[in-house]
């Protein structure tokens, strides 16, 4: 068996990495370490990743639950798009969600997430933390959640040409789920059709309070058709749909409280179409990965000014808008990627390619509002961006050096009919030094830029869009991350860690226009410009020990973000350097993870315990009716127990059980809005819940 530390194995990992990162096979059993498919490629020493095998052994139904024992990424909030994502505290405006090479950067509304992802359809999730290297793709300033969906070959068992998968789950906190898939692969043809259905009613938090507005009906579909011409060439056509429907207000992140209540029928639907080609060993090219895609997002919600109970009785919302009249906003992203790799000499490789994306938004119709404000001359928002890159991996045993250069360019056409364009070069460099078979060091310095996003689709026809002027000298945001890390492995003991510093300059500010509601006039136009800097620094440490069937783990992460410059939240300037929001960052502070599990061989049963802890941290925010709040997020400690039983002693049948939040703790995640406002109350996390799930492939 080839040693995992031999030069050829180390290079095979780097062929996959192709970036200024750290590559290793983490926490796999000794007999599996030589399998290339087990290798995890990550941009930092402490990995954040999840595989299909892990998901099948859990009761998780959303990405928040999937990521709760991962270091460096947080998800907080209610259900569905009420959840906010962050990577090392950096918010969604600076991070990417890439699914099978498809992505978009436009958001509907700052009171909801722009990400939708059902883990039931996923093969693997790898989180690239912080500023990416040259090959990381468009806009990789804060990190990328890189997702691969399942293929037929991932699910087939015992050499069969076709198969089925069935699954179901129940939660004591008013939730149920069911899923089914049929798939096959024969004579080069493969097909997969999968669906997942989730029904969550309003859940209770740790104090027994019902968090109204957390109710969610969700379905997701995945369809794939493909053909492998031979072992080196294949094409795939994929359709993916994510659909969420609930009883929400116009601001999904808040509960339905007092007179601020939701409306049935609000929904978000995302549909993506993706055509992929995979080629290997084509002349001087070792690898060709290419795709073209389109993503369409529809969002309906109540008009601004949520209906009150009295308005429900009369059939109209505040402002005289009928209850049944929901506003529809649309986003479309179309793009293509071409990624190539060539090897030469004594274990050297160059990766190079092109990324392209075009985005448009169609705001909800606010004709009456626009007429009042005199905003007649307006356009749809649109943006085009492309990037070209080259990246080299140089085998200088015992050092592997990576160097990269990327050029990105954008052109942005705003609703105000004004435009801006800008191009920028971004270098990256990194090194891995294998001091010996057990100890490695890494260092990297990455730079990346991110084009401005389109205005929020819901607001592009008013104060945040048509009434805002675009700075003709607008530039892309530029991020630079420096990181030092290590990994040490000795028999069954593993320790990895890193320290990092990241700076994002020329932050793009979307300052809204000021409107006098009494006179229905614009008193000051808004502006889109470069206005600030976001600095984050911190560290991560992860340690694990395995002895027979026993595995113990402990980890810690710490991030301190600071915001400076002429920054605005809406029409108001920020009040402090720790003023958080979904636009920039969440103060996640210092967080700890602990775990202990034991794997029995007969019966094939794993039982475990997980502890999650967050220390209190200061923050600044604005709450409705409360003004500026300089507060402290309460710390918390939450414990879960879980079990996975495989009755057939194989991974095709899993029976899963969990008790989450055993102590019934009432708490809020640090990766979401924290303070209560008048009628604007953010969601708490779920209280104690018992969860049971089963999945079977045959």
Locations of regions flagged by a protein language model:
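N-terminal periplasmic "start-of-domain" segments of outer-membrane beta-barrel proteins
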Residues: 33-66, 84, 92
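Extracytoplasmic beta-strand/coil segments of soluble accessory domains associated
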Residues: 64-103
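Outer membrane beta-barrel strand-and-loop segments of large Gram-negative receptors
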Residues: 327-329, 333-340, 381-389, 474-475, ...
């Amino acid at each position: 068996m080839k040693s995992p530390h031999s030069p050829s194995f180390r290079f095979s990992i780097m062929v996959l990495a192709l970036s200024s990162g750290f590559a290793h096979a983490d926490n796999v059993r000794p007999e599996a370490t030589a399998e290339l498919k087990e290798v995890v490629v990550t941009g930092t020493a402490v990995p954040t990743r999840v595989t299909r095998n892990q998901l099948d052994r859990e009761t998780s139904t959303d990405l928040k639950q999937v990521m709760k024992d991962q270091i460096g990424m947080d998800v907080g909030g209610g259900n569905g798009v009420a959840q906010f994502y962050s990577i090392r505290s950096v918010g969604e405006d600076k991070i990417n969600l890439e699914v099978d090479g498809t992505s978009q950067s436009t958001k509907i509304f700052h009171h909801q997430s722009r990400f939708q992802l059902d883990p039931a359809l996923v093969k693997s999730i790898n989180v690239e933390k912080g500023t990416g290297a040259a090959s990381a793709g468009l806009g990789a300033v804060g990190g990328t959640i890189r997702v691969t969906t399942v293929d037929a070959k991932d699910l087939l068992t015992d050499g069969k040409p076709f198969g089925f998968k069935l699954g179901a789950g129940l939660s004591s906190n008013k939730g149920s789920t069911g899923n089914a898939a049929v798939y096959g692969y024969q004579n080069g043809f493969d097909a997969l059709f999968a669906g997942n259905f989730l029904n969550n009613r309003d859940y209770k938090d740790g104090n027994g309070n019902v968090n109204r507005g957390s109710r969610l009906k969700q379905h997701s579909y995945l369809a794939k058709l493909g053909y492998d011409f031979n072992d080196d060439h294949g094409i795939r056509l994929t359709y993916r749909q994510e659909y969420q429907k609930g009883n929400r207000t116009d601001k999904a992140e808040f509960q339905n409280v007092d007179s601020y209540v939701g409306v049935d029928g609000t929904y978000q639907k995302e549909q993506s179409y993706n055509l992929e080609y995979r080629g290997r060993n084509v002349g001087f090219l070792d690898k060709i990965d290419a795709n073209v895609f389109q993503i369409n997002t529809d969002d309906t919600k109540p008009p601004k000014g949520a209906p009150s109970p009295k308005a429900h009785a009369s059939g109209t919302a505040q402002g005289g808008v009928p209850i049944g009249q929901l506003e529809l906003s649309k986003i479309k992203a179309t793009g293509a990627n071409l990624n190539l790799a060539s090897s030469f000499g004594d274990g050297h490789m160059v990766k190079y390619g092109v990324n392209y994306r075009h985005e448009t938004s169609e705001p909800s119709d606010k004709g009456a509002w626009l007429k009042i404000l005199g905003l007649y001359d307006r356009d749809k928002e649109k943006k085009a961006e492309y990037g070209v890159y080259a990246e080299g991996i140089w085998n200088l045993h015992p050092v592997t050096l990576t160097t990269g250069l990327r050029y990105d360019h954008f052109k942005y056409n705003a609703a105000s009919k004004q435009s801006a364009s800008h191009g920028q070069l971004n270098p990256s460099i990194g090194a891995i030094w294998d001091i010996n078979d057990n100890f490695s060091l890494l260092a990297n310095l990455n730079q990346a830029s991110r084009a401005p996003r389109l205005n929020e689709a819901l607001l592009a026809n008013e104060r945040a869009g048509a009434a805002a002027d675009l700075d003709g000298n607008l530039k892309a945001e530029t991020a630079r991350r420096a990181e030092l890390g290590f990994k040490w492995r000795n028999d069954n003991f593993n320790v990895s860690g890193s320290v990092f510093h990241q700076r994002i300059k020329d932050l793009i500010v979307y300052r809204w226009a000021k409107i006098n509601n009494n006179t229905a006039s614009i008193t000051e136009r808004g502006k889109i410009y470069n206005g600030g800097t976001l600095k984050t620094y911190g560290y991560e440490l992860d340690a694990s020990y395995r002895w027979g069937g026993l595995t113990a783990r402990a980890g810690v992460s710490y991030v301190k973000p600071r915001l400076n410059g002429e920054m605005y939240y809406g029409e108001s300037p920020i009040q402090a350097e720790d003023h958080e929001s979904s636009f920039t960052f969440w103060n996640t502070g210092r967080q700890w993870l602990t775990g202990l599990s034991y794997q029995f061989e007969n019966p094939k049963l794993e039982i475990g315990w997980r502890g999650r802890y967050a220390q209190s941290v200061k923050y600044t925010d604005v709450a409705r009716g409360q003004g500026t709040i300089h507060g402290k997020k309460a710390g918390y400690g939450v414990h879960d127990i879980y079990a996975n039983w495989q009755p057939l002693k194989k991974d095709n049948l899993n029976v899963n059980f969990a008790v989450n939040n055993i102590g019934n703790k009432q708490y809020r995640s640090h990766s979401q809005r924290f303070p209560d406002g008048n009628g604007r109350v953010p969601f708490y996390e779920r209280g104690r819940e018992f969860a049971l799930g089963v999945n079977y492939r045959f």
